[in-house]
Amino acid sequence: MDKDQFHVIIVGGSIAGLTLAHCLHRAGISHVVLEKASEPAPQIGASIGILPNGARVLDQLQLYETIEQYIEPLETATIGYPDGFRFSSSYPKLVNERFGFPIAFLDRQKLLEILYQHYPDKSRIRLAARVVSIESSSIDSTITMEDGTIYKGHLIVGADGVHSRVRAEMWKAAQRINPGMTVEYSCIFGISAPIKGLIVGEQVNAFFDHLTIVTIHGKKGRVYWFLIQKLDRKYVYPECPRFTAKEIGPIVNHLKEVKFFKDITFGQLWDSRETASMTALEENVFDTWYHGRMVLMGDSAHKMTPNIGQGANMAIEDAAVLSSLLSDLLQKQTQPPTNAQIEKLLAQYREVRHPRVNSIYKTSRFLVRFQARDGIFNTLFGRYYAPHAGDLPADMASKTIAGGELCAYLPSPSRCSYGWEKYKNSGLGRTVWCVLVLLLSALTWSCLGNMNIIMELPKRVSMMR
């Protein structure tokens, strides 16, 4: 059958949804995007990290050259501790050399604007389109909008975020609820004007007890920042905290004098803000990604903290894999795919994506607790091992990046470097586990009053790499 006879309905004009629209357009597959907001790129104060695995797909879609005009590649990361000790790492620069794409940040609003403005047929992107019901049959699926408009398609994709309507309808149709999402941290995030002393192309990570402040210094000194705090207890979705503008004030006032880099305080960051907001940080990878002719992608399927910077990149990879599987299936069809064929395809999609996403999610869970010095393990690991780890942070990031997915029906980017093959099947997992085992041993010894063994950890690990 012609690919344009198969119709995909994308719920959500998010980064996930708009990237999928670009992927489907390149594959020649008919689709429409339904976005409930009245504008395509609202400013909510958020920034987005584009890592090489996401950049590579965006390059395939001929979008990355435009994105490059608004980013400043990171070259250095500085990490600081409550006792005043600081060290710097060039791992971001090393990652760029290995993969041909940098680690970089830009306004979430700007990325959405690029995705929207460079989409060739804007009649396919419907704004102010609020879904009120979803029905699925053995032949097709139907979505009814608040204004009474009805859309019919062969597949519904939920790219509608952490509070996904499609996910809720999917659970209802499957007659099961599959929650598991929890919240233990909150995040105040924002964008500020340049601040003297914060150097373009650098990232600052300030680790305190149950508090992390991260700043990324982008194009022309624009500062993207996160303030992450541990909450009073663990919350289980949907009973999660919501924060209003009034609630941010007292928290900010309490932290204004905190110095996160040399003599620069959080108050300076706050006072120079252009925009800021506060949210709970949900964490989960859902087990159920599809049912019938409905499937999830992006934050509707998996939600992680911003510490690892992979949230948007995972959504971009989702779009690449789902569109590749659809393109391959439709090339072989003379008739619209049956329910069984759709279910097989969606099972393949989950089989490809779930293990990779889950692995990165676990790293994200570790990082948010490690950076917030949550417990003696993370406190000692951060203070006494991390400053002497050498290239291990770059190696771990490389392992994560190298497994990235591509649009199988589009040419691979020519700018890719040696790291994609070198680190795809590297044995870094063994090194990480060795670090953890040694650190646990060190903790035992430290309890007996012998801290010297902790200082020997980097030497012992380097012997195993």
From Swiss-Prot:
Its localization reads: Membrane
Q: How does it sit in the membrane?
A: Multi-pass membrane protein
- Its Enzyme Commission number(s) read 1.-.-.-
Broad enzyme group: oxidoreductase
Q: Which residues bind FAD?
A: 35, 49, 108, 299, 312
Name the UniProt record assigns to this protein: FAD-dependent monooxygenase penM
Indicate whether Oxidoreductase appears among the record's keywords: yes
Q: Which organism is it from?
A: Penicillium crustosum (Blue mold fungus)
Summarizing the function annotation, the protein's role is: FAD-dependent monooxygenase; part of the gene cluster that mediates the biosynthesis of the indole diterpenes penitrems. The geranylgeranyl diphosphate (GGPP) synthase penG catalyzes the first step in penitrem biosynthesis via conversion of farnesyl pyrophosphate and isopentyl pyrophosphate into geranylgeranyl pyrophosphate (GGPP). Condensation of indole-3-glycerol phosphate with GGPP by the prenyl transferase penC then forms 3-geranylgeranylindole (3-GGI).
Which family, according to UniProt? Belongs to the paxM FAD-dependent monooxygenase family.
Query: Cross-referenced InterPro entries, in alphabetical order?
Result: FAD-bd (IPR002938), FAD/NAD-bd_sf (IPR036188), FAD_mOase_fung (IPR050562)
Gene Ontology CC annotation, any one:
membrane
Which terms in the Gene Ontology molecular function aspect does this entry carry?
Answer: FAD binding; monooxygenase activity
Per its Swiss-Prot or TrEMBL entry, what cofactor is needed? Answer: FAD
For the keyword Oxidoreductase, the answer is yes
